């Protein structure tokens, strides 16, 4: 086929998560043996990640853990939603943590929350690409903001297919050029 990379998705927290981790880990190991790169979409999927009206599917600590697991199974690049909040560990009672982690290491700032995601990719050894999100009304500004946050946090870029390809060609190209200008 001539492929130079493979990609896969793991839905951490889903019923199939353990199987996905094992199968994709094997596939990534084989890909590396063949000299191929690996890309992993690390997404959280569990209704328990919503507590008291807050959705922790994009929580820096939970997505960071997903990123860490993804890099551990040999993902070269991790695609993840950009963190929008934090405190998922304490809210859902998952794992152990300390209040100073949230107060000192990852204050409530989008760059710091995304940096936490990068740190969990072995300090950027595996690249973090944030998703661009769904297409909407203010896509150009949102894409540039997401790109700036990703870059300042130490990420490698973003994937913005829906924002760019669900538009007229001229608008999509303008959006992609704006993202390229950031990087």
Task: Please place each PLM-identified region on the residue numbering.
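Alpha/beta enzyme core
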Residues: 1-128, 137, 141-156, 181
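Glycine-rich beta-strand-to-loop/alpha-helix junction loops that act as flexible
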Residues: 129-134, 160-163
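C-terminal helical cap(s) of enzyme catalytic domains, especially alpha/beta-barrels
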Residues: 153-154, 165-183
